[in-house]
Amino acid sequence: MNILPFSKTYEGRCVLDFPGMELQPGKIYAIIGANGSGKSTFAKILAGVLKADQRGCFLNTTSVGYMPQKNYAFRMSTKANILLNGKDEARANALLDAIGLRELENKRADRLSGGETARMALIRLMMKHYDAVLLDEPTAAMDMETTLLSEKLIAQYVRETGCALILVTHSLQQARRIADEVLYFHKGKLLEFGPKEQVLYEPKAPETKQFLEFYGV
């Protein structure tokens, strides 16, 4: 599965210039970088929420799942929200148990806390199998316990489906825990890409080294 080269320009200024890459099935790709580096713009373009300057981004797949930073909840029960993305009730029950929301399955989803809404949105996405999945800061509203629980479920979903998963994260520790490959964005450009051991511990670009030193990896 390939991502074709693309760029994004706002008011005459290029905010993202991506050279393209090949995604391997069954791998987790963590996107790291400072605020404003282009991480979320990258995810939104791949998800089709934003348009790139060029036509088309993904090659060889139209099966893409996306969880944005801001999650939506319809005015119905938590379980009913989850079943909007698939009617397999046994799977919904298993996911509710796995993410710790079973006791809230009948609560109106628009009354959940931020962390609960994020967990609901994550398992709602997991009701379907996709070739590629984009998660934009999926655990930002969660505490450490539910973050680790969600990371375990994400890794399990990738193993189960064989999808390629792109994870935008502000947490270098999260990238270290569950990523296979890491992409470092700097001022709208992909500055470093490779196995997490190389990017996080033996980076080549001085900007990457400075970023990692600042955030304590």
Indicate residue ranges for each PLM-predicted region.
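C-terminal boundary and immediately downstream tail of ABC-type ATPase nucleotide-binding domains
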Residues: 197-217
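Conserved ABC ATPase "signature" region
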Residues: 89-104
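Conserved catalytic motifs of ABC-family nucleotide-binding domains
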Residues: 71-84
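H-loop/switch region of ABC-family ATPase nucleotide-binding domains
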Residues: 169-170
